[in-house]
Amino acid sequence: WIMGHMVNAIAQIDEFVNLGANSIETDVSFDDSANPEYTYHGVPCDCGRTCTKWEYFNEFLKGLRKATTPGDSKYHEKLVLVVFDLKTSSLYDNQASDAGKKLAKSLLQNYWNNGNNGGRAYIVLSIPNLAHYKLITGFKETLTSEGHPELMDKAGYDFSGNDEIGDVAKTYKKAGVTGHVWQSDGITNCLLRGLDRVRKAVASRDSSNGYINKVYYWTVDKRATTRDALDAGVDGIMTNYPDVIADVLNESAYKAKFRIASYDDNPWETFKN
């Protein structure tokens, strides 16, 4: 999965997919009542990027729905996965469940079209703080109470705080999550980060008792780092330059081993090295 980073304006969906992304990452900020409000990152952000592009969250979802609904004039067949980077640090811990409930309602109405031919992309809810695990339970409860438990098949989870792998595993247990797990590792492109924890995450993914289905590394803009991440066995790379990742995947060393994921590739299925 080539994951376009910080896609917060509807116009950027086309831009990133046309550069080679089959997945996008979108920031979601919340208001004081735990309603998802804007797709907005703010300052500071990655080096070389404009930090302030935004939409109202529900409007972004409508644009995203068009981009992922077959037959729509804005449809992109290859856009198959969306990571919502949930900026929950503005919330109190006890608001996490409410945030999950409200997120589910927004997605149900504006993205999944109340279960009636909505957008088809898989969704990953990426949470920066292990203490906010009740966001997941609130999200699932709401899809069930609103009559659409089947949409949980389209949703997965990620804790993005670079926590100890063992602590993340314990948190999923508390949240009742037994699958659909992506594990991120990374840092802003302005700084360097080694691949030690990525390798641990990949080892956990490939073990018989690991909780991880997929591992992705962020934010990668250089060819050399892309090669290092691929050599470490990641499933996804988040980038500001999807064309760079696509170029490396075309190199003879990687062409035989990797391909770009399509809609038929289940993002919740573990593919071991």
Swiss-Prot record:
Return the cofactor note field: Binds 1 Mg(2+) ion per subunit.
Q: Glycosylated where? A: N250
Tissue expression, as annotated, is: Expressed by the venom gland.
Q: Which GO terms describe its biological process?
A: killing of cells of another organism; lipid catabolic process
What Gene3D superfamilies does the record point to? Phosphatidylinositol (PI) phosphodiesterase (3.20.20.190)
Listed GO MF terms: lyase activity; metal ion binding; phosphoric diester hydrolase activity; toxin activity
Q: What is this protein called?
A: Dermonecrotic toxin LdSicTox-alphaIB1ai
